[in-house]
């Protein structure tokens, strides 16, 4: 499989039948994962990328919010049959459906985010979430007064362990004595949209001494951010920049530029001349992941903290610090 990197220059719910009505030939399509388009996190980042493309080009796109896993193959076939190109999918659960459908539509280009499908008309985009999580883990440890940090993941799957493992490594890098409290909202897709449980897990972490909690849980993470704000402690957002949700309480957000991936896919994947099948990996060097600093959290991060994070970022890019990727061997050496 071809593996490529996108440069910084490039990185610059309705029913299915209703969505497809009137779809124009070669309009791009985006299918969001379970959890809702407006989850203020992963799916919403994908939506924002589609909207950015629309604003830049004046073009139209079609989209769909999945209601259940059974819709995946049906949605792909219907969009492809209507002439949508490219078809972009957000989420790691698309592997089987896309592997089945892509060969049926050899003239359609597909782009999938967060999983790998080895087909000649598929571009797979992965992110180095572990390196971005390393940086926010370091910032969390530098900010913490208790030395105890929490993590609330969504669905208990390897990808979310990848976030946790990077976070824990970053925390331990700057404070070897840091204590990490790890929890997940569930083992089914419902885990992405359960802010009540996520808030309870954040409270449990606080009860054990945590004063900073990283939420990598999709829509469920909103419960973590709320619980930490209510308690006067700090949270860390994920995927989208969530600093604005609770100014002065969200320490930072581990941003994952799903939005730019979607915009780039809409711009390039519909044309065979610019389509890049194979695997594309976006990391710190490509600004595919990172941490957010803006007017909502700039008073929470000292110049020294930001300087440390930037130094760590440079060392990771240079290869001087190696951040272990949980998904390579299902382990997290700390």
What are these language model-derived features?
Residues 2-12:
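Bacterial N-terminal signal peptides that target proteins for export
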Residues 13-14, 24:
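Cleavable N-terminal signal peptides
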Residues 20-26:
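Sec/Tat signal peptide C-region and signal peptidase I cleavage site
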Residues 26-334:
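A residue-level marker of the well-folded mature domains of exported/periplasmic proteins
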